[in-house]
């Protein structure tokens, strides 16, 4: 099933997307949380504002071409998130996830990644505290990690690669 929002959609509590659903958003969505089952897809071309969390389960796909704001971004195994504009959360926690970031991704309190693969193409990640456990980070032309307080990368666990003019 597909849900298409081209206007303003406000959900008082939790918006739930069931398995196999696709959400296309070209309007504005405001909700407490978005609860998602596996095998689901969100394509956001405008704005999603959450008071709580966006939890991306396994076999999930997110394509953000607009803006997404919330308290928590949690992504689990086999989730793929592609960010082409702005994603801003208080905390971001990613486990065995693939993230393709071409623009702005920010965690205002903390960022944690375990077993995740990041592909940055001129995008940046900003957080006061960052922790990378396992996983791979690929930084391309003009990409940047901005850890304003601390960054933790246990030796031998995370792999960082850079390419382009400023590596």
Please tell me what each predicted stretch does.
Residues 1-167:
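Extracellular beta-strand-rich, repetitive "passenger/adhesive" scaffolds
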């Amino acid at each position: 099933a597909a849900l298409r929002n081209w206007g303003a959609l406000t959900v008082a509590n939790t918006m739930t997307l069931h398995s196999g659903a696709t959400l296309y958003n070209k309007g504005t969505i405001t909700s407490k949380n978005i609860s998602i089952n596996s095998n689901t897809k969100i394509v956001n071309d405008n704005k999603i504002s959450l008071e709580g969390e966006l939890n991306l389960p396994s076999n999930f796909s997110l394509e953000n071409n607009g803006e997404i704001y919330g308290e928590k971004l949690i992504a689990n195994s086999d989730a793929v998130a592609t960010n082409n504009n702005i994603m801003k959360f208080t905390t971001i926690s990613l486990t065995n996830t693939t993230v393709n970031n071409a623009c702005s991704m920010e965690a205002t309190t903390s960022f944690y990644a375990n077993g995740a693969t990041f592909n940055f193409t001129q995008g940046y990640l900003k957080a006061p505290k960052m922790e990378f456990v396992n996983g791979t980070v690929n930084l391309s032309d003009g990409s940047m990690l901005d850890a304003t307080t601390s960054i933790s990368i246990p030796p031998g666990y995370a792999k960082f690669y850079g390419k382009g003019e400023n590596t």
